[in-house]
Amino acid sequence: MIVPVPLGDRAYNVHIAPGLLARARTIIAPLTARRHVAVVTDSTVARHYLEPLRAALAAAGLSIQPVIVPPGEASKNWRTLETVVESLLGFGVERGDAVVALGGGVVGDLTGFAAAILRRGCKFVQIPTTLLAQVDSSVGGKTAINAHAGKNLVGAFHQPAAVLIDPDLLDTLPPRELRAGYAEVVKTALLGDAAFFDWCDANVAALLAGDTPARTHAIATSVAAKAAIVAADERETGDTRALLNLGHTFGHALEAQAGFSDRLLHGEAVAIGCALAFRFSAERGLCPSGDAVRVTEHLSRAGLPNHPRGIAATAAPLIAHMLQDKKMRSGTLPFVLASGIGHALVARDVPLGEVEAFLDRVLAEV
């Protein structure tokens, strides 16, 4: 299956198929001028998939030059970025070459940002190995590292030359990370596809249990939705792409409060953020309270957190993190809220005092 991302001279295809890693040479070989392919991955993914990728590319006469970074969100920093860039320069990577990102969202963000600044821009290919990366971060061209002030505050838009999604790579993913990735699937349904949310309700158990057709359908539906949004608003200059931030304003603040650590995975933060966005929308009279309850219950059934308890004692530190959000404009922070399941909207008239009061009420719950 191929999902096109139509962006003029930056257009590319997202290839989705079980077993695709073994056929990676057919997509990667035409994209690189050298016989050596630089591959950025992390030490966990390398143990499972570096050799299969090496074998797949060897069939086309290509060898790999690996750059292996530590796993986890903590690697999205200046130091690791410098390591990646200097390694790629040491390999002699040129503009006509394609660097491969083999890993989850952290590896994809690091590699994409390195490719964006290397020789003022070289090609890169995404081979996402987590559900979160397959359904969200590998598509759309957002690349970034974290700063002390907050998440994804240093980065660039740099579209990949191709994305290769193999659902079979999820077989080695720890259950917690699989569930965290599923949060982005749910987010896709919540922001614009009520029928897809119904499908998620009926198929979440099968997807998490390893059903390949269910996983492939969830991935393809999510990718197609994101591709359409990116094509309409590539650089988030309007409200269309901003809808993808459903759950992220709350979520990023929670991640920052948790120290960008394994204490709270990104997808878990998004799950809590989506639950909060629907509760807040219901309190403001935008959304039926029944929809907010349904979202919370679905996340619980998926084994995902839906409440910020244990992350912060009061709202004040979360609001402080929100003030560093990259979406801030003239001191105003837009929130993605909802009028119902499948109907997200951007609200630009939300006083932070109202948000703080809401969060304090939520955090006071036992």
Named regions from a protein language model:
Residues 183-185, 286-366:
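C-terminal charged capping/lid subdomain of soluble metabolic enzymes
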Residues 1-98:
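ATP/NTP phosphate-donor binding region
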Residues 106-113, 134-135, 252-253:
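Short glycine/serine/threonine-rich phosphate/pyrophosphate-binding segments
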Residues 6, 32, 91-94, 117-119, ...:
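Solvent-exposed alpha-helices and their adjacent loops that cap or buttress functional pockets
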Residues 203-316:
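Active-site segments that bind and position negatively charged phosphate/pyrophosphate groups
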Residues 85-100, 111-126:
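Non-catalytic interfacial helical region
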Residues 113-206:
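A glycine/threonine-rich phosphate-anchoring loop and its flanking beta-alpha core
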